[in-house]
Amino acid sequence: MAPRYHSAAEADTGVCGETKSRDSDALYDLPLRDPEEDQTTVALHPGSGEERFPVFQSEFTSVPVSDGGANGVTYPVGGSRKEQDEISSRGPPAYSLEIRGKTSEQLAESGADDEGTNGEKQSLLVPCLAVFSSNYNFTVTSIALFLMNQDPLYKDASDTVVGSSTVKMLSYAGAIVGMCTMGYLGDLIGRRLAMILTLALVFIGALLSSICAWGDGVTVLVIMGVCRFVLGVGSGGVYPLSAVSAAEGAGSEKSNDRSMRVSWAYSMNVPGIMFPYIVALVLWCTTHNVDVCFRILLGFGALPALLIWLPAWRMKEDRAYVAKDFAKHLAGVFVSRSYWRQLLGTGVCWLLYDVTAYGILLVQPEITQSIWGNSSSVTDVIWQNIILNGMGIPGCFMGILVLKQMGVKWLQFWGFVGLAVSAFLMAATVEILQGKAWAQLVLLCIVNFFINWGASITTFILPSLVFPPEVRSTYSGISAALGKIGAVGGIYTMKAILSTGGLTPMMICAGVPSLAAAILTWFYVDPVPNTLRSSFLQCFGSLAGSCPFIDCRKFRRGSRAFE
């Protein structure tokens, strides 16, 4: 997966990295692509003539521009206001570089960055609460249906065609649709308007699923399924839009700054997953009325969307992110083969991660009942899931803490390895620890830690870093949609295996996709032509980064992206 820049000095080798030109100390950001040739083309306009040269394997490039004088002064194009003031004081360059239809002189006059809102850092309030809202609404479906099964009316309906599994499936089907459509709208009409639309759908879907589901058990589940589909479209759209908005609002082109902002936005994922169980515990301890409990649980999901709807209207956005021509934008999204290759590192890894993560997380009530037995009370099951999901909090924040140290690639790699090993370990000890419920719960907590420690963060970050701004939201949505496809497959697969084969085969099947994703991460995330020895040095050297006080970046010099 190519990083955001590389220099003209590396054009012949295709090696990617954020380095300076061999002819100059200046860096230039030139987003010019020729999708048909699957390469970058930089156009130079020396007076009346025109020169072009190709630069492969990169979305942006860096070239020196000479003023033609005796001193051989070079001029940065784009860049910060200070750099552009220096350009003005030296005089105009002899070559005019066209960037997205603008010459370097026009860019220098406007002082606008190629990306972002003119370098102004934006608040993380909307992305953070949007992520919280999305994960709350995805998770609350499972716990609400679990509570509904305590009532014979709904329990009998769950055994029909429109059972609880169908309601969950409709929620995730809506999410897949929302991720693709809202991600695309984020590029077409802008991140702000698309976010406003997604929040409106979340509010409507959550509210209607709470107040409109009345009647017999089957009718309630049918209405709830339709409403959760609408909510899923909105909640799914939150994923690409919140990640891209957080990254582009960094006020900086540095991938470290962007990745940290996206990771902090994603940190609301764990509270969003955990909060439905806390609300359910309070409600169930207050009243054992199933109707009251599940309706308040579902309706609460509308509140975060309502709270941030007005701040979303006030979000600032650069017009450069809005597609001017619908047809050209549509063609540009799907024409480049390099984008689809990058999906192996973003979308397919996300798919494999969600097979494991959602397969385990959303059947945790069933897993805990298989550990403790069906005699556990509703309160016990809720407490057990609060404890399990609570392990995600240190996992998530420890992952964020070492993100800069380890780098996105190796944090994802070791996250997948840790998740696979912990799942296999739990599978191997099920028979040994039979009857020792708390020992099995500890192992399940370790699995939950690795679910949130590595790949959970990086799969959310990567699409917002590696794709160019014109298609960033679209491909972030496609990557997230692939993840939700994996989630749907994981839910059905893990639940079926758990009910037929037990916990041991289920945990084995949960570990295999993580192992496959670790292999894909090695080869398709930031691929750099290193020797095998160098790659292993980077890989195992990055383990030192798991300690926040040790700088392991010197071990990863051959892997320059996302540092």
Curated annotation (Swiss-Prot):
It comes from the Eukaryota. Residues 149-168, 214-217, 285-291, 364-380, 434-440, 499-504 are cytoplasmic. Residues 1-127, 190-192, 239-263, 313-342, 402-412, 462-477, 526-563 are extracellular. Residues 1-51, 67-96 are annotated as: Disordered. It catalyses: phosphate(in) = phosphate(out). The chain crosses the membrane at residues 128-148, 169-189, 193-213, 218-238, 264-284, 292-312, 343-363, 381-401, 413-433, 441-461, 478-498, 505-525. Belongs to the major facilitator superfamily. Phosphate:H(+) symporter (TC 2.A.1.9) family. PANTHER family: CARBOXYLIC ACID TRANSPORTER PROTEIN HOMOLOG (PTHR23508:SF10). This is Inorganic phosphate transporter PT2. It comes from Toxoplasma gondii (strain ATCC 50861 / VEG).
